[in-house]
Amino acid sequence: MDLMSFKEKEISKKDCLELFEDTENFFDVIKLADSIRKDIVGDTVTYVVNANINFTNVCSGTCKFCAFKAEHGDPNAFFLNPDEVAKKALEARKIGATEVCIQGGLLKEIDTYFQAEILKKVKKITEPYEEIVVHAFSPMEVKSAAENAGLSVNEALKILKENGLNSMPGTAAEILNDEIRSEICPTKLKTSEWIDVVTNAHKTGIKTTCTMMYGHIEENKHLAEHLSILRKIQKETGGFTEFVPLTFLHENAPLHHMERVKSGASGMLDLKTYAISRIFFKDYIKNIQTSWVKLGTKLSQVSLNCGANDIGGTLMEESISKAAGGSYGTFMSEEKLKDMILAVGRIPKQRNTAYEIIE
């Protein structure tokens, strides 16, 4: 394998698969990814001061990797109304958050108009403190809410944008292969539907992130296929702001009890995934975010030398990873994030959702 030729050229899906299959050149792959990272984004590592607001844990979904879901009537079930969501957003804004990430569940009572009401309330209550960016509703949530409202996805996206939606999390992607999806999230939107929602969001002027959850039942060919789909979308729309690899947290997830399921990814696969993503995307998707919530502080720091250039956010509240067995906390102060970055010899810079540096 001529790794050095991969530095300049756009590698194919076949090349990508070969990198995942390769067991002999791990450190050379890491070194190449770090070199590409330095060429494209330099030594700056960005972070965002943000808050996660999960407005309900009640959901009709059947995702087998989710340990966060509750049923109606469960003692731990909760459902925040739009005013309660707005109050949480205001609290976050008052202590410096520039972004709130708002997500909920799949329920008949959650339609596009309910989502729009959340957006309006958040925008109104935070207006006196300078506008906060609302990064909200996964592609699955948008599709489900549109159906509940009797709207097309396009109609729903326009309503959400008009009411203050600034950007969307590109979650619900998991692995973009319908055979895998039929096993791990059988009632979630299909690959083509996920693509339809995000491409239409981009065309509506709503940027999104993109993600990939790995370390469960997928094979290397599925990882290469997934990255290839994301790059194709980015070439067409340019609407992805970042790529976030999400390592599967298995401890409390129902999926963990299925045969064939791995006990999460190895540390080697975690780092390899960051590296191969950087080599594959190059500057099509310039920003690759590491997740301290899922990897922990030390492995996140190592990933910054494997192609990643963003360390995510302060979060302030993050319930989903914690429910799945994540043990690295749900909040990290801005000072600690900066210390993490400085400790590996890189330059910390606060950014906004659009990756513009906040001086």
Curated annotation (Swiss-Prot):
GO terms for molecular function: 4 iron, 4 sulfur cluster binding; 5-amino-6-(D-ribitylamino)uracil--L-tyrosine 4-hydroxyphenyl transferase activity; 7,8-didemethyl-8-hydroxy-5-deazariboflavin synthase activity; iron ion binding. Residues 45-282 form the Radical SAM core domain. Its cofactor is [4Fe-4S] cluster. Binds 1 [4Fe-4S] cluster. The cluster is coordinated with 3 cysteines and an exchangeable S-adenosyl-L-methionine. [4Fe-4S] cluster binds at C59, C63, C66. It is an enzyme of class 2 (transferase). Its EC number is 2.5.1.147. It catalyses: 5-amino-6-(D-ribitylamino)uracil + L-tyrosine + S-adenosyl-L-methionine = 5-amino-5-(4-hydroxybenzyl)-6-(D-ribitylimino)-5,6-dihydrouracil + 2-iminoacetate + 5'-deoxyadenosine + L-methionine + H(+). Pfam families: CofH_C, Radical_SAM. PROSITE patterns: RADICAL_SAM. Pathway: Cofactor biosynthesis; coenzyme F0 biosynthesis. Belongs to the radical SAM superfamily. CofH family. PANTHER family: FO SYNTHASE (COFH) (PTHR43076), LIPOYL SYNTHASE 2 (PTHR43076:SF1). This is 5-amino-6-(D-ribitylamino)uracil--L-tyrosine 4-hydroxyphenyl transferase. It comes from Methanococcus maripaludis (strain C5 / ATCC BAA-1333).
